[in-house]
């Protein structure tokens, strides 16, 4: 079972800020990326693995495979940093029975129909609804760009999307 675990949404996945600040904040020895699309793409998997230090264990799993691995050994006997590219994969994992009680929201690029919610984090209405639904189901979800920042609640989502509840 993971000794210590942190779960984060950041569409950049494994990058400098994750490696220099977040991974060191929990002294992570393993990064688990959960993403159906990337788990099937050998080139993108290799790019993510090359981005990490040589001594860092990296797993890139589909949601279904993540549930299997979790049920088998809770991602191993390591301090684990779990990364998602978007909120839909968190919901999919929850629907499959893998629930993470605390989720930090980092960068989600402000593109297409996304509106800026918090710093470099954008959501569209469907993503906002998904997050609020997950919160209603008991998950603790918060905005926090770097470990030294204060955790911010999802209240600002309701201000940007007043029709979402």
Language-model segments: which ranges?
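Long, hydrophobic N-terminal alpha-helical segment
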Residues: 2-57
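Structural motif
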Residues: 3-7, 29-32, 57-59, 78-82, ...
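Short gly/pro/ser/thr-enriched loop/turn and capping motifs at secondary-structure boundaries
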Residues: 39-41, 66-67, 110-113
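Generic hydrophobic/aromatic pocket-lining and core-packing "Φ" positions
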Residues: 19-20, 90, 131
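Glycine-rich, aromatic-bearing surface loops/beta-hairpins
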Residues: 96, 101-165
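A general structural motif
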Residues: 10-13, 62, 123
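NTP/phosphate- and nucleic-acid-binding module
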Residues: 25, 49, 53, 58-61, ...
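Ordered, amphipathic secondary-structure segments that act as subunit-interaction surfaces
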Residues: 59-106
């Amino acid at each position: 079972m993971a000794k210590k675990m942190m779960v984060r949404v950041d569409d950049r996945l494994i990058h400098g800020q994750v490696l220099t600040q977040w991974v060191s904040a929990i002294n992570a020895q393993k990064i688990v990326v959960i993403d159906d699309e990337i788990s099937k793409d050998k080139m993108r998997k290799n790019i993510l693995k090359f981005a990490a230090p040589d001594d860092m264990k990296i797993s890139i799993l589909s949601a279904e495979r993540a549930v299997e691995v979790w049920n088998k050994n809770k991602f191993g006997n390591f301090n684990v940093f779990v990364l998602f590219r978007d909120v839909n994969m968190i919901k999919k994992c929850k629907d499959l029975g893998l629930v993470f009680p605390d989720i930090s929201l980092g960068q989600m690029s402000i593109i297409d129909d996304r509106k800026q919610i918090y710093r470099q984090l954008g959501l569209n209405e469907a993503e906002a609804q998904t997050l609020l639904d997950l919160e209603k189901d008991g998950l603790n979800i918060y905005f926090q760009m770097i470990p030294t920042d204060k955790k911010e609640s999802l209240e600002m989502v309701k201000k940007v999307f007043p029709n979402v509840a």
